[in-house]
Amino acid sequence: MERKWALLLFLGMVTLVSCGLREKHVQKLVALIPNDTVRSILKAVVHKAAKTQFGCPAYEGYCNNHCQDIKRKDGECHGFKCKCAKD
């Protein structure tokens, strides 16, 4: 039962992340899970998923929107990661 609950939570979090929520929002949801191995695994998975930015190659303008949102700079896709312009 615990595995099914963890899988359901994981899939829900992946869905939320793909909708444009940032890692900090999803980590707040992870904090609601009791402190155990499942929680630490979910935290690591959410962190890795947030770093890869799967929308980068799939959606035109994704990185520009992402970089404007977090740094107020232009951005471009580089592999599976967004690169924001430097000063």
Swiss-Prot record:
Protein location: Secreted
Endpoints of the signal sequence: 1-19
A Pfam family it matches: Scorpion_toxin_alpha-beta
A GO molecular-function descriptor: toxin activity
A single Gene Ontology CC term: extracellular region
Covalent S-S links between cysteines: 56-77, 63-82, 67-84
Described function: Inhibits voltage-gated potassium channel.
The protein, known as: Potassium channel toxin Ttr-beta-KTx
Biological source species: Tityus trivittatus
